[in-house]
Amino acid sequence: MSRTNLPIQPAKMSDATSSKPQIFSIQDLKQAASDKMSQMYRDYYNGGAMDNITLASNEAAFDRYLLRPRVLRNVSNIDMTTTLWGTKAALPLGVSPSAMHRLAHADGEVGTSKACAARNVPMILSALSNDTLEDVSGQSSDGSTPYAIQVSPFKNRQITTNLLSRAKAAGYKAVVLTVDAPMFGRRLDDLRNGFSIPPGFSFPNLSAQTQSGSGGLGGGIPDLSFDTAATWEEKIAWMKSQTDLEIWVKGVTSPLDAQIAIEQGVDGIIISNHGGRQLDTTPATIDILREIAPIAKGKTRIAIDGGFRRGSDIFKAVALGADFVFVGRIAIWGLAYDGSNGVGLALDLLINEFKLCMGLAGCSKISDITPAHLSILNAKGVLESVY
């Protein structure tokens, strides 16, 4: 049975405290977090576009990739570290940009960042954050945790230039341009719920002229018009003229676009279908990675998000050629469950599962993880190599 077909079971209650669920997996955390959120905000975070086909596919696709462990390997000392944006990271795992963390918990993006910094886990901050980018990166007291700022193709380019300037001054290492959202996807749950944000919500990283309007999401969202005429050639060249931060693009799902990204000289791509929130019935990102990695590996850095729920999912992505994995909803679930401490719990679950998977698969360092550690089950029930 696919993991997406498994019913969400209520988290177990301890004997000592019947109100405190025991969290042993991301699935447990999702349930506990969802129980704490209102329907409007729970559906906003958990839902996708239209019929949620891509949302479900992102998660279910991992079950097709089967682990092939190597045995009698020295795994007495497992090193999960890697590099991102020229900086050392604890493992190939980071937090994706997602808007308005204070909808989940008052700790907001600062709380998410605090948990990331304590574990040297990179974070991409959304332009639509509720905390200043300076306060967010300031949670890494020694500056060792890598941060990037996310931007969209705003029609008002002054928004982007302001963000780039502030991010550079605050020690950010990269800018991540979201390229799969020239307009907002149709999210039926948000429409049914009449999605809006609480009065008084602020977006301190945006210029004053954006602080009113609907922005296409719902009441109270800044009025951010997107440049629907943006093209690869013009947009990337302009970004390069504005900053010396690394430039990554997020939202690549076509091998053709991966090739163009390489030709335009971006520093990295993030294979992403926006968590199934933009165009429904696009392929699962882990399947797209299998297409794109042979084209892009060694020519640009490759990251991926979408559907990751286990440390073994991270392992599978690295085996298929990803340099890095990002998660979005998982951090939100942690935040909703217990603020910054909940984000830490979420990250620790994935970190511990990933380390265990490396050890059981016979890998003592990231470079040991190869396509030989995976097989895929074809329609005839026969195991095949992934490449």
Curated annotation (Swiss-Prot):
> Quick one: which residues bind a 2-oxocarboxylate?
44, 187, 277
- The region called Disordered is annotated at 1-20
Concerning CDD domains, the annotation shows: alpha_hydroxyacid_oxid_FMN
Q: In which pathway does it act?
A: Mycotoxin biosynthesis
State the InterPro entries in the record.
Aldolase_TIM, Alpha-hydoxy_acid_DH_FMN, FMN-dep_DH, FMN_HAD, FMN_hydac_DH_AS
> What keyword terms does UniProt attach to this protein?
Oxidoreductase
What practical use does it have? Answer: Fusaric acid is phytotoxic to plants such as cotton and banana. It has been shown to induce programmed cell death in plants. In addition to a mild toxicity to animals, fusaric acid exhibits acanthamoebicidal, antioomycete, and antimycobacterial activities.
Q: Which residues bind FMN?
A: 126, 150, 178, 250, 305-309, 328-329
Instruction: Give the Gene Ontology MF terms in alphabetical order.
Output: FMN binding; oxidoreductase activity
Identify the catalytic residues.
274
Which EC numbers characterise this protein's activity in its record?
1.-.-.-
Q: Where is the FMN hydroxy acid dehydrogenase domain?
A: 18-379
Assigned protein family:
Belongs to the FMN-dependent alpha-hydroxy acid dehydrogenase family.
The entry's function note states:
Oxidase; part of the gene cluster that mediates the biosynthesis of fusaric acid, a mycotoxin with low to moderate toxicity to animals and humans, but with high phytotoxic properties. L-aspartate is suggested as fusaric acid amino acid precursor that is activated and further processed to O-acetyl-L-homoserine by cluster enzymes aspartate kinase FUB3 and homoserine O-acetyltransferase FUB5, as well as enzymes of the primary metabolism.
Protein name as it appears in the record: Oxidase FUB9
